[in-house]
Amino acid sequence: MSKIEKKQASASNLLLGAGLNLFETSSLGQPLEVTKVQMAANRTQTMAQAIKAIMSRGGILGFYQGLIPWAWIEASTKGAVLLFTSAELEYWGRRLGLGATSAGAIAGMGGGVAQAYATMGFCTCMKTAEVTRAKQAATGQEVKGTFRVFADLYKEKGIRGINRGVNAVALRQMTNWGSRLALSRFLEKPIRYFTGRTEAEPLTTGQRFVASVSAGALSCWNQPLEVARVEMQSLTKGIQHSSPGIMQTIMSIYKNNGIKGLYRGAVPRMGLGAYQTFVMVFLADCVRGYLAK
Protein backbone atom coordinates (compact mmCIF):
# COMPACT_ATOMS: atom_id res chain seq x y z
CA MET A 1 0.00 0.00 0.00
CA SER A 2 1.43 3.38 -1.04
CA LYS A 3 2.02 6.08 1.55
CA ILE A 4 -0.86 8.52 1.94
CA GLU A 5 0.30 12.07 1.32
CA LYS A 6 -1.62 15.31 1.62
CA LYS A 7 -1.91 17.35 -1.57
CA GLN A 8 -0.11 20.61 -0.94
CA ALA A 9 -1.70 23.90 -2.00
CA SER A 10 1.24 26.28 -2.45
CA ALA A 11 0.86 30.01 -2.99
CA SER A 12 2.02 29.65 -6.61
CA ASN A 13 -0.58 26.97 -7.29
CA LEU A 14 -3.32 29.11 -5.74
CA LEU A 15 -2.28 32.11 -7.85
CA LEU A 16 -2.15 29.94 -10.96
CA GLY A 17 -5.58 28.53 -10.17
CA ALA A 18 -7.03 31.99 -9.65
CA GLY A 19 -5.49 33.23 -12.89
CA LEU A 20 -6.77 30.29 -14.91
CA ASN A 21 -10.22 30.58 -13.33
CA LEU A 22 -10.32 34.25 -14.33
CA PHE A 23 -9.25 33.32 -17.87
CA GLU A 24 -11.87 30.57 -18.09
CA THR A 25 -14.64 32.85 -16.86
CA SER A 26 -13.62 35.79 -19.04
CA SER A 27 -13.38 33.73 -22.23
CA LEU A 28 -15.98 31.03 -22.88
CA GLY A 29 -17.06 30.32 -19.30
CA GLN A 30 -19.35 33.30 -18.74
CA PRO A 31 -21.18 32.95 -22.10
CA LEU A 32 -21.98 29.32 -21.25
CA GLU A 33 -23.02 30.37 -17.72
CA VAL A 34 -25.33 33.10 -19.07
CA THR A 35 -26.86 30.67 -21.60
CA LYS A 36 -27.43 28.11 -18.85
CA VAL A 37 -29.09 30.69 -16.59
CA GLN A 38 -31.22 32.07 -19.45
CA MET A 39 -32.57 28.60 -20.26
CA ALA A 40 -33.12 27.70 -16.61
CA ALA A 41 -34.98 30.96 -15.92
CA ASN A 42 -37.04 30.79 -19.14
CA ARG A 43 -37.87 27.12 -19.34
CA THR A 44 -40.04 27.31 -22.47
CA GLN A 45 -37.18 28.68 -24.59
CA THR A 46 -35.10 26.50 -26.88
CA MET A 47 -31.35 27.03 -26.93
CA ALA A 48 -31.66 29.04 -30.15
CA GLN A 49 -34.33 31.26 -28.58
CA ALA A 50 -32.22 31.68 -25.44
CA ILE A 51 -29.19 32.76 -27.50
CA LYS A 52 -31.36 35.19 -29.49
CA ALA A 53 -32.72 36.68 -26.24
CA ILE A 54 -29.20 37.10 -24.85
CA MET A 55 -28.01 38.75 -28.07
CA SER A 56 -30.90 41.22 -27.84
CA ARG A 57 -29.44 42.51 -24.55
CA GLY A 58 -26.31 44.05 -26.04
CA GLY A 59 -25.07 41.66 -28.71
CA ILE A 60 -21.95 39.73 -27.76
CA LEU A 61 -21.69 41.74 -24.54
CA GLY A 62 -24.99 40.20 -23.47
CA PHE A 63 -23.10 36.95 -22.90
CA TYR A 64 -20.86 38.68 -20.37
CA GLN A 65 -23.49 40.13 -18.04
CA GLY A 66 -22.46 39.63 -14.43
CA LEU A 67 -18.80 39.15 -15.33
CA ILE A 68 -17.58 42.28 -13.53
CA PRO A 69 -17.28 42.19 -10.60
CA TRP A 70 -19.30 39.15 -9.47
CA ALA A 71 -17.91 36.41 -11.73
CA TRP A 72 -14.38 37.72 -11.22
CA ILE A 73 -14.78 37.70 -7.43
CA GLU A 74 -16.09 34.15 -7.56
CA ALA A 75 -13.41 32.93 -9.98
CA SER A 76 -10.52 34.41 -8.00
CA THR A 77 -11.58 32.89 -4.67
CA LYS A 78 -13.52 29.65 -5.17
CA GLY A 79 -10.51 27.64 -6.31
CA ALA A 80 -8.51 28.34 -3.16
CA VAL A 81 -11.45 27.41 -0.94
CA LEU A 82 -11.97 24.13 -2.81
CA LEU A 83 -8.27 23.22 -2.83
CA PHE A 84 -7.72 23.78 0.88
CA THR A 85 -10.93 22.08 2.04
CA SER A 86 -10.89 19.10 -0.31
CA ALA A 87 -7.18 18.39 0.28
CA GLU A 88 -7.70 18.23 4.05
CA LEU A 89 -10.85 16.10 3.85
CA GLU A 90 -9.42 13.66 1.32
CA TYR A 91 -6.22 13.25 3.34
CA TRP A 92 -8.03 12.52 6.60
CA GLY A 93 -10.54 10.30 4.83
CA ARG A 94 -7.71 8.13 3.50
CA ARG A 95 -6.01 8.18 6.91
CA LEU A 96 -9.22 6.81 8.43
CA GLY A 97 -9.20 3.90 5.99
CA LEU A 98 -11.61 5.09 3.30
CA GLY A 99 -11.03 4.12 -0.32
CA ALA A 100 -10.08 6.63 -3.00
CA THR A 101 -13.65 6.91 -4.32
CA SER A 102 -15.24 7.45 -0.89
CA ALA A 103 -12.55 9.88 0.26
CA GLY A 104 -12.87 11.76 -3.02
CA ALA A 105 -16.64 12.02 -2.60
CA ILE A 106 -16.34 13.40 0.94
CA ALA A 107 -13.59 15.81 -0.12
CA GLY A 108 -15.64 17.09 -3.04
CA MET A 109 -18.81 17.46 -0.99
CA GLY A 110 -17.03 19.34 1.79
CA GLY A 111 -15.15 21.55 -0.65
CA GLY A 112 -18.34 22.35 -2.55
CA VAL A 113 -20.22 23.35 0.59
CA ALA A 114 -17.31 25.52 1.72
CA GLN A 115 -17.27 27.25 -1.68
CA ALA A 116 -20.98 28.02 -1.52
CA TYR A 117 -21.05 29.60 1.92
CA ALA A 118 -17.66 31.33 1.71
CA THR A 119 -17.93 33.14 -1.60
CA MET A 120 -20.28 31.65 -4.22
CA GLY A 121 -23.60 32.43 -2.52
CA PHE A 122 -23.76 36.16 -3.11
CA CYS A 123 -21.75 35.92 -6.37
CA THR A 124 -24.18 33.49 -8.03
CA CYS A 125 -27.09 35.52 -6.67
CA MET A 126 -25.78 38.70 -8.27
CA LYS A 127 -24.76 37.00 -11.53
CA THR A 128 -28.27 35.58 -11.89
CA ALA A 129 -29.75 38.96 -11.00
CA GLU A 130 -27.70 40.57 -13.78
CA VAL A 131 -28.91 38.08 -16.40
CA THR A 132 -32.57 38.09 -15.40
CA ARG A 133 -33.02 41.75 -14.47
CA ALA A 134 -31.88 42.95 -17.91
CA LYS A 135 -35.31 41.96 -19.25
CA GLN A 136 -36.87 44.74 -17.17
CA ALA A 137 -35.86 47.26 -19.86
CA ALA A 138 -38.34 45.71 -22.29
CA THR A 139 -41.23 46.24 -19.85
CA GLY A 140 -40.47 49.89 -19.20
CA GLN A 141 -39.13 49.41 -15.70
CA GLU A 142 -36.08 51.26 -14.41
CA VAL A 143 -32.79 49.53 -15.14
CA LYS A 144 -30.55 49.96 -12.09
CA GLY A 145 -26.80 49.57 -11.84
CA THR A 146 -25.42 46.32 -10.47
CA PHE A 147 -24.32 47.86 -7.16
CA ARG A 148 -27.74 49.52 -6.77
CA VAL A 149 -29.36 46.11 -7.15
CA PHE A 150 -26.91 44.71 -4.58
CA ALA A 151 -27.78 47.55 -2.18
CA ASP A 152 -31.53 47.03 -2.68
CA LEU A 153 -31.26 43.30 -2.00
CA TYR A 154 -29.19 43.98 1.11
CA LYS A 155 -31.60 46.68 2.29
CA GLU A 156 -34.57 44.35 1.79
CA LYS A 157 -33.30 41.34 3.76
CA GLY A 158 -29.72 41.99 4.81
CA ILE A 159 -27.20 39.17 4.36
CA ARG A 160 -30.02 36.78 3.48
CA GLY A 161 -31.08 39.07 0.66
CA ILE A 162 -27.76 38.89 -1.16
CA ASN A 163 -27.44 35.17 -0.43
CA ARG A 164 -30.82 34.08 -1.76
CA GLY A 165 -30.63 30.49 -2.93
CA VAL A 166 -27.33 29.86 -1.13
CA ASN A 167 -28.61 26.54 0.26
CA ALA A 168 -29.40 25.41 -3.28
CA VAL A 169 -25.90 26.52 -4.32
CA ALA A 170 -24.44 24.51 -1.43
CA LEU A 171 -26.41 21.39 -2.37
CA ARG A 172 -25.46 21.80 -6.02
CA GLN A 173 -21.78 22.26 -5.22
CA MET A 174 -21.81 19.42 -2.69
CA THR A 175 -23.38 16.93 -5.11
CA ASN A 176 -21.49 18.31 -8.11
CA TRP A 177 -17.99 18.14 -6.65
CA GLY A 178 -18.77 15.02 -4.64
CA SER A 179 -19.84 13.28 -7.84
CA ARG A 180 -17.03 14.76 -9.93
CA LEU A 181 -14.18 13.80 -7.59
CA ALA A 182 -15.67 10.39 -6.74
CA LEU A 183 -16.36 9.56 -10.40
CA SER A 184 -12.92 10.82 -11.42
CA ARG A 185 -11.28 8.47 -8.91
CA PHE A 186 -13.61 5.64 -9.96
CA LEU A 187 -12.96 6.14 -13.69
CA GLU A 188 -9.22 6.13 -13.10
CA LYS A 189 -9.44 2.42 -12.22
CA PRO A 190 -10.53 1.14 -15.67
CA ILE A 191 -8.06 3.55 -17.29
CA ARG A 192 -5.24 2.07 -15.22
CA TYR A 193 -6.48 -1.45 -16.01
CA PHE A 194 -6.55 -0.95 -19.79
CA THR A 195 -3.25 0.99 -19.89
CA GLY A 196 -1.40 -1.29 -17.49
CA ARG A 197 -0.55 1.47 -15.01
CA THR A 198 -0.19 0.64 -11.32
CA GLU A 199 -1.61 2.69 -8.44
CA ALA A 200 1.82 4.18 -7.83
CA GLU A 201 2.17 5.46 -11.41
CA PRO A 202 0.55 8.83 -12.18
CA LEU A 203 -1.86 9.06 -15.09
CA THR A 204 -0.93 11.12 -18.12
CA THR A 205 -2.54 14.51 -18.72
CA GLY A 206 -4.74 13.03 -21.46
CA GLN A 207 -5.89 10.17 -19.24
CA ARG A 208 -6.75 12.52 -16.39
CA PHE A 209 -8.56 14.77 -18.87
CA VAL A 210 -10.74 11.87 -20.06
CA ALA A 211 -11.58 10.88 -16.48
CA SER A 212 -12.34 14.46 -15.43
CA VAL A 213 -14.47 15.38 -18.46
CA SER A 214 -16.45 12.14 -18.19
CA ALA A 215 -17.00 12.74 -14.48
CA GLY A 216 -18.01 16.35 -15.13
CA ALA A 217 -20.61 15.34 -17.72
CA LEU A 218 -22.04 12.60 -15.51
CA SER A 219 -22.23 15.03 -12.58
CA CYS A 220 -24.96 17.03 -14.33
CA TRP A 221 -27.56 14.62 -12.91
CA ASN A 222 -28.18 17.28 -10.23
CA GLN A 223 -29.41 19.87 -12.76
CA PRO A 224 -32.78 20.21 -10.89
CA LEU A 225 -30.85 21.85 -8.04
CA GLU A 226 -29.28 24.30 -10.49
CA VAL A 227 -32.65 25.16 -12.06
CA ALA A 228 -34.12 25.66 -8.58
CA ARG A 229 -31.16 27.85 -7.65
CA VAL A 230 -31.72 30.05 -10.71
CA GLU A 231 -35.44 30.31 -9.97
CA MET A 232 -34.77 31.33 -6.36
CA GLN A 233 -32.25 34.00 -7.40
CA SER A 234 -34.05 35.29 -10.50
CA LEU A 235 -35.19 38.92 -10.66
CA THR A 236 -37.50 38.35 -13.63
CA LYS A 237 -40.44 39.43 -11.46
CA GLY A 238 -38.47 41.97 -9.46
CA ILE A 239 -37.26 41.56 -5.89
CA GLN A 240 -39.45 38.92 -4.28
CA HIS A 241 -40.51 39.41 -0.67
CA SER A 242 -41.12 35.69 -0.11
CA SER A 243 -38.34 33.10 -0.13
CA PRO A 244 -39.64 29.61 -0.99
CA GLY A 245 -37.47 26.67 -0.01
CA ILE A 246 -35.59 24.35 -2.36
CA MET A 247 -38.17 21.54 -2.42
CA GLN A 248 -41.05 23.99 -2.77
CA THR A 249 -39.29 25.60 -5.74
CA ILE A 250 -38.54 22.24 -7.38
CA MET A 251 -42.14 21.09 -6.98
CA SER A 252 -43.41 24.36 -8.46
CA ILE A 253 -41.13 24.00 -11.49
CA TYR A 254 -42.19 20.37 -11.96
CA LYS A 255 -45.86 21.33 -11.73
CA ASN A 256 -45.51 24.07 -14.35
CA ASN A 257 -42.88 22.63 -16.70
CA GLY A 258 -42.67 18.91 -16.00
CA ILE A 259 -39.50 16.86 -15.68
CA LYS A 260 -37.97 18.58 -18.73
CA GLY A 261 -38.21 21.92 -16.95
CA LEU A 262 -35.94 20.62 -14.20
CA TYR A 263 -33.21 19.84 -16.73
CA ARG A 264 -33.28 23.06 -18.74
CA GLY A 265 -29.77 24.35 -19.36
CA ALA A 266 -28.13 20.95 -18.87
CA VAL A 267 -26.41 21.04 -22.29
CA PRO A 268 -24.58 24.38 -21.82
CA ARG A 269 -23.74 23.28 -18.28
CA MET A 270 -22.09 20.12 -19.64
CA GLY A 271 -20.19 22.28 -22.12
CA LEU A 272 -19.13 24.57 -19.27
CA GLY A 273 -17.85 21.60 -17.27
CA ALA A 274 -15.84 20.33 -20.24
CA TYR A 275 -14.34 23.76 -20.90
CA GLN A 276 -13.45 24.27 -17.23
CA THR A 277 -11.71 20.90 -17.23
CA PHE A 278 -9.80 21.79 -20.42
CA VAL A 279 -8.54 25.03 -18.87
CA MET A 280 -7.78 23.67 -15.41
CA VAL A 281 -6.16 20.41 -16.64
CA PHE A 282 -4.48 21.02 -19.99
CA LEU A 283 -3.67 24.73 -19.71
CA ALA A 284 -2.61 24.35 -16.07
CA ASP A 285 -0.13 21.62 -16.98
CA CYS A 286 1.18 23.66 -19.93
CA VAL A 287 1.74 26.73 -17.73
CA ARG A 288 3.40 24.67 -14.98
CA GLY A 289 5.69 23.07 -17.57
CA TYR A 290 6.62 26.45 -19.01
CA LEU A 291 7.34 27.96 -15.58
CA ALA A 292 9.43 24.94 -14.59
CA LYS A 293 11.86 25.52 -17.47
Swiss-Prot record:
It comes from the Eukaryota. GO terms for molecular function: tricarboxylate secondary active transmembrane transporter activity. GO terms for biological process: alpha-ketoglutarate transport; mitochondrial citrate transmembrane transport. Keywords: Membrane, Mitochondrion, Mitochondrion inner membrane, Repeat, Transmembrane, Transmembrane helix, Transport. GO terms for cellular component: mitochondrial inner membrane; mitochondrion. Its main location: mitochondrion. It is a multi-pass membrane protein. The keyword Mitochondrion applies. This is Uncharacterized mitochondrial carrier C83.13. It comes from Schizosaccharomyces pombe (strain 972 / ATCC 24843) (Fission yeast).
